[in-house]
Regions:
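Flexible propeptides and autoinhibitory/regulatory segments associated with cysteine proteases
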Residues: 1-7
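Catalytic phosphate/metal-binding cores of nucleic-acid and nucleotide-processing enzymes, i.e., regions
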Residues: 3, 23, 27, 123, ...
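Secretory-pathway luminal glycosyltransferase catalytic domains
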Residues: 3, 39-169, 252, 259, ...
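A structural signal for short, well-ordered beta-strand segments and their strand-loop junctions
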Residues: 6, 33-38, 136-138, 173-175, ...
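Donor-binding and catalytic core of enzymes assembling or modifying cell-surface/extracellular glycoconjugates
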Residues: 13, 166-251
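Tryptophan-centric aromatic hotspots in well-structured domains and transmembrane helices
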Residues: 18, 142, 158-161, 180-186, ...
Length: 269
C-alpha cells in the first residue's frame, strides 16, 4: 500500500497522544489508513510507546515496521496545518494543540479514553471518585528540575490561588512525582495521594470532576478526556520558561480558566 499515514511517537505519554491524535485526524480527513510502530523513535523521559499498546493505545493499529515513508515535519511551535504526501507519509513533530484534530474531538476522545474495565476497577479502589465535586491536582516537579528555565515548576502559591478559582470540592486526588513535598507544603482534609502506572494515573485524573493542571501535556490530556460537561479547569498562563518555545498559545483550550502567573528563577507562582 502507498497511501498510509504514520507518525514518530516520542516523548512522554501526553506528547505521544498528541502525535497519534494528529495522525489519526489526518487519516480521517483524507480517508487513509493510519498505522504506528511501537518503537518508532528514540524515547525521551523513558517512555516507550510499547508500554501503552494494551491500554491507552489499544485502539491504534500497530505494525512491526514501516518502509518507504516520506517524512513531513511540523512547522513552528504554534499550530500550522501540515499535509500528508500523496504516498506513504510519516509525520514528525509534537502537534500540541487540539487544532490538529479539530472536528474530530469526539473520535479522539473515544480512542484514548479509559476502558470500561479500568473504570469499574478504579471506582472499586477509589469510591471517593463517585463524589460530586472531586478535584485532581497535578504537581510536576522531578524531571522539571533538570531544565526549569524550559519547564518551569508551579509552586504551592500557584496551587493555593488555583484552589480559590475552583471553589468548593469534596475530595482531592493528588498526582505528583514528589508527594513528600506536597504533604509538607499543601494541607487537605480529604485527600488521596495516587501512586500508580502513568497511564492509570492519567485515566484516573480524567475521572475527577474538576482539575488544577500544570504546564504538562499529561494533565492536558487528562482534562480533555474528562467528559463532565461542567468541569472546571485551572491552568497557568506560562507554559514554557525563557529557554523554551514562546509561541505556545495554541496549546490552551477555551474552556480553561487561565491563571495569570509570574516566572521567577524557574518557578511559577
Amino acid at each position: 500500500m502507498n497511501n498510509l499515514i504514520s507518525c514518530n511517537l516520542m516523548g512522554g505519554l501526553g506528547n505521544q497522544i498528541f502525535q497519534a491524535a494528529h495522525a489519526l485526524a489526518e487519516g480521517m480527513k483524507y480517508n487513509r489508513e493510519v498505522v504506528f510502530v511501537p518503537q518508532s523513535w528514540t524515547p525521551m523521559q523513558g517512555r516507550q510507546a510499547s508500554n501503552y499498546v494494551n491500554n491507552v493505545f489499544r485502539n491504534l493499529k500497530f505494525v512491526d515496521s514501516i518502509d518507504g515513508f516520506e517524512k513531513v515535519t511540523e512547522g513552528p511551535w504554534e499550530y500550522s496545518d501540515v499535509f500528508p504526501k500523496d504516498h506513504n507519509t510519516v509525520f514528525d513533530g509534537y502537534f500540541q494543540s487540539s487544532k490538529n484534530f479539530l472536528g474530530f474531538d469526539d473520535e479522539i476522545r473515544k480512542t484514548f479514553s479509559p476502558s470500561e474495565e479500568f473504570i469499574t476497577e478504579v471506582y472499586e479502589k477509589y469510591p471517593e471518585l463517585k463524589q460530586e465535586n472531586t478535584l485532581s491536582i497535578h504537581i510536576r516537579r522531578g524531571d522539571c528540575f533538570m531544565n526549569p528555565d524550559i519547564h518551569p515548576i508551579a509552586n504551592e502559591k500557584y496551587v493555593e490561588r488555583a484552589l480559590n478559582e475552583i471553589g468548593e470540592y469534596t475530595h482531592v486526588f493528588i498526582f505528583s512525582d514528589d508527594k513528600n513535598w506536597v504533604k509538607e507544603n499543601l494541607k487537605f482534609e480529604n485527600v488521596t495521594y495516587v501512586d500508580d502506572e502513568d497511564y492509570k494515573e492519567m485515566w484516573l485524573m480524567s475521572l475527577c470532576k474538576n482539575h488544577i493542571m500544570v504546564n504538562s501535556t499529561f494533565s492536558w490530556w487528562a482534562t480533555f478526556l474528562n467528559t463532565n460537561a461542567n468541569k472546571k479547569i485551572v491552568a497557568p498562563s506560562i507554559w514554557f520558561g525563557p529557554r523554551g518555545p514562546q509561541n505556545y498559545k495554541d496549546i490552551y483550550e477555551s474552556n480553561w480558566t487561565v491563571l495569570d502567573v509570574k516566572y521567577e528563577d524557574g518557578w511559577l507562582s
